[in-house]
UniProtKB/Swiss-Prot annotation:
It holds the Pfam family AMP-binding_C. ATP binds at residues 217-225, 358-363, 444, 463, 561. It comes from Fusarium pseudograminearum (strain CS3096) (Wheat and barley crown-rot fungus). Residues 359-421 are annotated as: SBD2. This is Acyl-CoA ligase FPSE_09184. Both substrate-binding domains (SBD1 and SBD2) are involved in the substrate recognition, and are sufficient to confer the substrate specificity. SUPFAM superfamilies: Acetyl-CoA synthetase-like. Its EC number is 6.2.1.-.
């Protein structure tokens, strides 16, 4: 059985508009929608407003400066990549669009990755140049030193929206291979008098092959992978999300927040979609709860795009929200991971006037595969499929699931879907032929269920790699996690499987205690209470017994996903607590 978008979802244009680069595509639509004087971006830290004229002028000069500095002949098909390691700022977007205009692609490095991980990414996608925000210069230099890149790679720094603090100044690397660092402003100054380049016009099929971004997966269950994302992938995803939002919420533009990292596909995609929609976007360098809450009232933010850990934090600290002006907020959209029903209900209880809109997506699917309509919210689900997305489910025996309420691995087919992984020792770049159907196995386990409104909703059960096999039974960690968070003493939890001589595997829970309920209780007493809460109410295969570890925090990726691979490392030498 193949699942598709609901009847009310609009169709994608056919053929897709693939003549322009991503930035030019978004800016052209923006200019159609609103006047040039409207604020396209607002950088929160310095309260700087950017109009579309400002953006296009800087984009044109930056592309000309890059072309001149790197001796690129106008019209030449330049097929190189630059690496960008930066906190959120408008220049990060403009820089990537300028690189696209001269024919290049961008390797988006995540600051939460280790220097070793970034070095491995750069070895797989060797950059022609590196651009680093001031606060990440030292980390970028360390990653460079650990890579096999030659010392002639040019380095450029830029300050972003916030002036660099003294301690953010680059620390010289003690090596003869240490790079010389220029600034983006110096580069721009050289291009002030240069003639502007013509905008890129893709030939037929070129946008399907031309890589715009290399983004890394979160690596929640294993190592990070580098995904090649084309201009077609991004443009298709913008249209899928943007047209669905217009059909379900209306075409009116909004004021939105961009604090999710631009180097992660979720933050990158929604910011492009905001631009295409005509929204005004308030850019924050990262997530700081107090600064975000102030910004919501100051800029009258309408919709918050969040990840489950932030939603959990807001629901646990609902009293803090009352100290700020939240009257403009109408919607919160969840992405970056499934939002369990219990977390949904906690947030709804904290702010009953907010519509909570769950969604689902992956880096390999270029961001968003499903989303909810405000008129069809189904707690615990990840929404309905977006236009052009098709999903089938494959069960443990390799058969395609033929009905509702049956679990299977999600396989997806979409114009926004995977172009390829970059070469690994055991896996070559995968580039499926576009003229054939290509179903990508996502590694997520899901099922479909009918909502009260009669629509097919996708429910994410768990990651295949995270499923726990107890006495031959497949146990979803999410089932245990959802139940544990119902207990007042549990703030956050993550469940993994560990080896067991009798059952094969058993569940083990990492738990962050809720400070208002549990700090005064001993770990032994609290462990007993939580164990009884879980083991007396869930099936035997879900029992924890004494396999509970209390931690101050859970390791997370830049997008807020819990890194279970790090938790598995911690239990390599674990033994049950003494009784």
């Amino acid at each position: 059985m193949i699942f598709t978008a609901p009847a009310y979802a609009p169709a994608l244009p056919s053929p897709l508009p693939l003549q322009q680069t991503i930035g030019d595509f978004c800016l052209a639509k923006r200019r159609e929608r609103q006047g040039a004087s409207d604020s396209l971006f607002i950088e929160a830290a310095i309260d700087r407003k950017w109009t579309i004229d400002d953006i296009e002028a800087r984009l044109g000069r930056m592309a000309a400066a890059l072309s001149s500095a790197w001796n690129i002949t106008p019209g030449q098909k330049w097929h190189k990549t630059v690496a960008i390691l930066a906190s959120n700022c408008v220049d990060t977007l403009i820089l990537s669009w300028a690189v696209h205009r001269i024919g290049g692609g961008c390797l988006m490095l995540q600051p939460t990755s280790s220097a070793d991980e970034m070095a491995a990414h750069m070895d797989r996608v060797p950059p022609f140049a590196m651009f680093l925000s001031q606060d990440l210069l030292t980390l970028g230099q360390e990653a460079f030193q650990k890579s096999s890149l030659s010392s002639n790679v040019p380095f450029y720094s830029f300050s972003g929206a916030e002036a660099p603090k003294p301690q953010q100044t680059a620390v010289p690397v003690a090596s003869q291979d240490a790079p010389n660092i220029s600034t983006l402003d110096d580069l721009m100054a050289t291009g002030k008098e240069l003639p502007l380049l013509e905008k890129t016009s893709f030939s037929e099929g070129e946008a399907s092959r031309r890589v715009a971004y290399y983004c890394t997966t979160s690596g929640t269950s294993g190592f990070q992978r580098v995904v090649a994302i084309t201009h077609e992938n991004i443009i298709a995803s913008i249209l899928q999300a943007g047209l669905f939002i217009e059909a379900t919420k209306g075409p009116a533009s909004e004021v939105t927040l961009a604090f999710l990292p631009f180097n992660h596909i979720y933050g990158l995609l929604i910011t492009h979609t905001f631009t295409w929609r005509g929204d005004s976007t308030v850019v924050h360098s990262g997530f700081n709860m107090m600064e975000i809450l102030i910004s919501i009232g100051k800029h009258r933010i309408n919709t918050l795009y969040l990840v489950p850990p932030i939603i959990n934090a807001l629901s646990r600290n609902a009293s803090i929200l009352d100290r700020f002006d939240m009257s403009s907020v109408r919607y919160i959209v969840n992405g970056g991971g499934p939002l369990p029903k219990e977390a949904f209900l906690k947030m709804k209880a904290a702010r009953p006037d907010w519509q909570i809109i769950p969604g689902w997506g992956q880096t390999e699917g270029c961001g968003i595969g499903s989303l909810s309509s405000p008129k069809d919210i189904f707690p615990g689900s990840s929404g309905v499929l977006l236009p052009g997305v098709r999903i089938r489910l494959r069960d443990d025996d390799g058969r395609i699931v033929q009905g509702l309420e049956e679990m299977g691995e999600i396989e997806i087919e979409s114009p926004s879907g995977l172009f390829g992984y970059v070469d690994y020792a055991d896996e070559a770049l995968l580039s499926p032929p576009k003229e054939e159907e290509f179903w990508w196995p996502t590694g997520d386990v899901g099922l479909f269920r009918i909502s009260p409104n009669g629509e097919q909703h996708l429910f994410i059960v768990d990651r295949i790699r995270d499923m726990i096999k107890v006495k031959g039974n497949q146990v979803a960690p999410g089932q245990i996690e959802d139940h544990l968070t119902k207990h007042a003493a549990v703030a956050e939890t993550a469940v993994i499987g560990i080896a067991d001589e009798v059952a094969g595997e058993r569940a083990l829970a990492f738990i962050v205690r809720e400070s208002s309920h549990a700090r005064e209780m001993s770990e032994a007493d609290l462990r007993k209470i939580i164990q009884e809460h879980n083991d007396l109410e869930l099936p035997e295969v879900c029992r924890l017994q004494d396999r509970i570890i209390f931690v101050d925090e859970l390791p997370k990726s830049a997008s807020g996903k819990i890194l279970k691979r790090e938790l598995r490392k911690q239990v390599a030498t674990w033994s049950p607590p003494q009784k």
